Amino acid sequence: MIDLRKLTEVQRRLSRKIVEKPIDIAKVKRVGAVDVSYKNNFAKAAFVCVEFPSGEIIKTKTIVTTVEFPYIPTFFFLRETKPILLAVKDENFDVLLVEGHGKAHPRRYGLASHIGVILSKPTIGVAKRLLRGVSKDTYVKVGKAFVSVGNLITLNDAVRIVEKLLDENGYPKPLNIADKLSKRGESREKE
């Protein structure tokens, strides 16, 4: 049996590890993006790395692993951490876009924050919808995306990076590519 009260307390404690600080956007050369899809008891994570600010694809990679945690709203970080960490392992990027929330979360600690805290790298939460109970000061809507701080970045810098990577549909191009790759049949790496 999963104890949601304990998990809630763990999440609140972990949220204190988030650091918001400005980054030098002129030094950002590679932006990674990661998304996960599910089929049966398997998770498929896709990683895409693009040049910044051009958005030109440098690398794509997908991995498949077993699912170890059920889907529980607002505890997504427990389900997606393993596949995401496997997908970004040994990859070189300056900032990571995560399909999911960062501080735009009822406990101010979503998936993007968790990944950023674990990796000690700048992460940005990018989501298509808001969760209930989210404070308006934790996100900015950019195109069709709700952008929030994951870790080691300010909301202003996160917005500036996402704005430069929007596609014609108003969503960050690297995340759209990662989404499509995560839903394709086979797993592979391409440079």
Curated annotation (Swiss-Prot):
Residues the record marks as site: Interaction with target DNA: 71
The name this protein goes by in its record: Endonuclease V
Source organism of this protein record: Pyrococcus furiosus (strain ATCC 43587 / DSM 3638 / JCM 8422 / Vc1)
Subcellular location: Cytoplasm
HAMAP family: Endonuclease_5
PANTHER family named in the record: ENDONUCLEASE V
InterPro entries, alphabetized: Endonuclease-V (IPR007581)
Top-level taxon of origin: Archaea
